[in-house]
Structure formats: C-alpha cells, structure tokens
A protein has these predicted regions:
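Low-acidity, Ser/Thr- and Arg-rich intrinsically disordered low-complexity segments
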Residues: 2-7, 11, 18, 23
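Generic hydrophobic alpha-helical membrane-segment signal
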Residues: 5-8, 13, 387, 484
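N-terminal small-residue-enriched
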Residues: 18-502
Length: 502
C-alpha cells in the first residue's frame, strides 16, 4: 500500500518518549512503530478530529467539477478525487508491537481525445498541483495508443440503492479503545487452550471520501468507513507447531464477535497437531468457508468480461450453457449491506447493482466496465474497479456470493462417508490456470470417515479443474461467513477431487 500525503501527530502520553509531528511528501508511507517496552497508549485526538468530521465528499465533488469544466472542445475529461485514512494496531504479548495512523488525499485525471488516453495524478489537492495534473494528462494523450474503444462511462439510468456506509460510532472510536480491544482478542485466544500461543492480534480500520465527475455527465460523491480484527495462532505439542487464524468484521467494533474469532483461531491450530501425510486418492472434499472464499476469488477473474474478450477465461463462448451443478447460483452483489465490500457506485461512478452470474448452474453473464462493454458490444454492469486516485479503472467482481443452502457445516460433514475437510490452502492463486481451469494447491485439514472428523492431515495437494469442480458440487452450506474480502465464505462439498499425499 502507498500513502500519497500524510499528516500525523502523536502526543507524548505514557510510553511515548516525545511528541512527533510529521508532514510527509507525496509517495512516502508513515509507520509509527512502538516496541513492547515503550508502547502503552497513543493519543487519538488528532485522528478522531479527522474521523468524526461531517461528510466532506461534496467538497471533493466541487474540485472534480471544476476540473471537468476546464475541458477543451473534442476532449472527454474525468476527475477522480479521494481522501482517506487508516489505523492499524498489532499487539504481541499484551503490548503494542506496531501502530500505524495515516491519511492520504489526491486526484487522478483522465483526458481522452481522438481515441487516445492521457492520465496523470498527484497526491495533493493543492490548486496549482491540480492544474499541473490536468496539463500533464493532456500532454500524455500524445503518447497514448489509439484505441477505438477508449471513452468514459455515461449515465445509464440505473438508480443507486441507498446504503449506509458511514458509522459514526466507528468514526469516534478512541485509539486507546482500539488498542484495548486488540489486547482483549489476544487474551481471549490465549485462554482457549494452554497449547496455543498468539503470533499476532490485529485491529484495522479505514475511512474514505471520494468524488468523480466527467464531461459525459457523471457526478457522484460519498464516504464510508469499515473495520475488522484478526488473530494468528501457533499451537505447540512437543517439537511440533501448527498455525491458525480467524477474523471478525463489522460496521463498528461493537459488532465484533471476539470470542468466536478467538475460538476459531485456536481450534484451527490445535486441530492440526499430530497431522500426517494422507494417502493419495480421489475423494470428496469439504471446503471451509475461508477456503471457499479464496476459490471464488480465483473464479472471479474468469467471469471478467475483459479477460473473456481477450481469451483469458475458460468461460469464453459458454454463455447460456450449464457450467455448474443446478444447486449453484452465484451473484455479485455489492448492494448487499452485509458484504464487507458493499458500495453504491463502481469505479466509474455508475450505480452498483446485483448481477446474477450463474443461475441454477447456467452461465448468465460476465461483469463489465464501460470499456470492456464497448469491446464486447454489451453494456456496463457497474463493475468498474479502481485502486484509488493513482490508477485508471479496471473491471472485476465487487462482492461475490453463492446462494446459501440450509445445512450447517457439522451436518454437511455428517453426510460424507469418506473425505477430507480442507481447512487451509497454500498458493491457490499461483496454482490456477484461468484459461484451462486446471488447479493444484497445497492443503491441510482433517480426514472424514463415516460422517465424523478423524485424524489431521497436511503436506498434500488437491487438484482438479475449476470447470469440473463447479459441476461436482454436491452440497452448499448455510454458514455464511462475512470475510474482509470481495467474496463471501460458506462450506462447500465437492466430490471426486484428486488428493495427492504419500
């Protein structure tokens, strides 16, 4: 992550040796790191003064509109303006090991003329700098590659679905409370099992304001904030050590379920103690919700309209065909307020919307930005993605979710005579070929025999193709897990997967 403009102030309270005031040039990233010996409390007055201010995204929209108003004849101009910040706390052995408090702001400007695109950005909202960015974007048009599909998004008449993205309680949450909460998560986790150590306990939150305006008529602005906690564990038994982890997310810290996160992190590690390498065979796998989320993340690239148009997806030419078990309905729904990545607009300012990608096993659509839609002769699905003011729009899924079933994970496991419960995978993204669909990934978990969890296993791989996996799904859990990612987790049962061990 890069932070383009940062202003920080830390007051000299207990454990902080002296006050520090920093004004950082563009491109720098500020970390305040406190050792176990000195870090006890951080003054949150400065941070809360930013986090609790009224919505200033309309100020950003005024800036964007002023830029767009300077468009010359024959130009399309887009101004994307944002401001945001984050807090990150890491606790180890009851003390603050790492603390980050940072803010950034900036503007990115696209200019399109005669099929060529120029782009420039700056990590400041200084008026002179903005004028320079616009001039640079115009100059960069000359270096752009001619593209018949180049252009900005235009209003498409799809109405936004009102959502609440800003939580005042989170905005006012004191830094000292964030630290106390992180320490409490560590304490709870340590109390779950005497064999468990906590590698790190973390609290993370962020806030952002954004505005986008274009010469094509888009005018949008808004703000949001979010938070989550995570904990990583180590379980020891003699010379053996196994790892675990867990998350909890919420609109505000009061929604965290710390006992659940602590229990899951401890169980993930202790369950694997004594794990052996399993025999190789074809078997049924039960994917833990976190693993399902990872697979959906990989699958999302194959449903990307731009990748499809470039021949980078095995779903090319499959629209209208059965590509999954009839139980499968897969949606991309950033309008669901429970999704961690919920939003009301995409990266181009179009309304976010619920898109049904696969319905009852049939491939219905691909996600599109305005650019990929022009390439494929379709319409934008409100799926433009953007990494911030320093980047131009891409395309991708925003909040994927499988339509859940009704059974719990325990009930699904009871229905498996012989299989393996996959608790963790390693190297999944690098182990998948999105064109052929082939995948092979390292895994660890628990064997299942006669519907009961048996011995732990590790150092094996599972392999199949994504196409085959979608068709071989035999059960879907109702245990939705809202993770801090673009894909929601739940338990999946898949037959006939190759497990390679000894």
């Amino acid at each position: 992550m890069s932070v383009d403009r940062v202003s920080l102030a830390v007051s000299p309270l207990e454990g902080i040796k002296s006050p520090t005031f920093l004004s950082i040039k563009a491109g720098d990233f500020v970390i305040i790191q406190a050792t176990q010996q000195v870090a006890h409390q951080v003054n949150n007055d400065w941070w809360n003064s930013i986090m609790s201010t009224p919505d200033r995204s309309t100020e950003l929209l005024v800036i964007a509109e002023r830029v767009v108003a300077m468009a010359k004849p024959g130009e399309q101009v887009e101004a994307y303006v944002s401001r945001g910040g984050e807090t990150a706390v890491r606790v180890y052995e009851g003390e603050v090991e790492h603390f980050v408090s940072a803010q950034s702001e900036g503007i990115g400007i696209r200019v399109i003329k005669d099929g060529r695109t120029g782009f420039a950005y700056a990590g400041t909202l200084d008026a002179d700098a903005i004028a320079e960015v616009l001039a640079d974007a115009r100059d960069n048009v000359a270096f752009g590659t001619p593209d018949e599909y180049a252009g900005l998004a235009e209003p498409d008449g799809v109405a936004q679905i009102p959502q609440k993205f800003w939580d005042d309680e989170l905005a006012a949450y004191a830094t000292a409370d964030k630290i106390s909460l992180t320490k409490e998560l560590e304490k709870l986790t340590l109390g779950m099992d005497s064999r468990v150590r906590v590698e790190e306990s973390n609290y993370d939150d962020g806030w952002g304001e954004v505005a986008v305006a274009t010469t094509t008529g888009i005018r949008e602005s808004g703000r949001g904030n979010s938070c989550y906690v995570s904990v990583s564990t180590l379980a020891d038994d003699g010379d053996e050590t196994q790892t675990g982890f867990s998350f909890s997310v919420g609109d505000s810290p009061k929604e965290f379920n710390l006992p659940k996160a602590a229990r899951e992190a401890a169980d993930r590690a202790t369950r694997l103690l004594g794990a052996v390498k399993p025999p190789s065979k074809r078997t049924t796998v039960v994917l833990d919700p976190y693993v399902t989320s990872q697979f959906l993340g990989v699958l999302s690239s194959t449903l990307n309209g731009e990748n499809v148009s470039k021949g980078r997806s095995f779903f090319a030419d499959k629209l209208g065909e059965t590509v999954a078990d009839p139980r499968i309905t897969l949606v991309d729904d950033p309008t669901n307020p429970l999704a961690y990545t919920a939003t009301d607009i995409d990266g181009e300012g179009l309304a976010a919307r619920r898109n049904v990608l696969i319905e009852n096993g049939v491939l219905k659509m691909f996600v599109q930005s305005s650019y990929s839609a022009r390439r494929t002769g379709t319409k934008s699905t409100g799926n433009a993605t953007r990494g911030g003011f320093a980047g131009t729009p891409g395309v991708g899924c925003l909040a994927m979710q499988l339509q859940p079933g009704t059974q719990s994970q325990e009930e699904l496991i009871k229905g498996v005579d012989d299989g393996v419960w996959i608790q963790m995978v390693q190297g999944l993204h690098s182990g998948v070929n999105p064109i052929s669909g082939d995948f092979s990934t390292g895994a660890s978990g628990m064997m299942i025999r006669n519907g009961a969890v048996a011995e732990p296993v590790r150092e094996f791989t599972i392999a199949s193709t994504l196409q085959r996996m979608l068709l071989d799904i035999v059960a879907i859990g109702g245990d939705i897990d809202w993770l801090p990612s673009r894909a929601v987790g739940l338990t999946l049962v898949i037959r006939d997967v190759t497990m390679s061990g000894q």
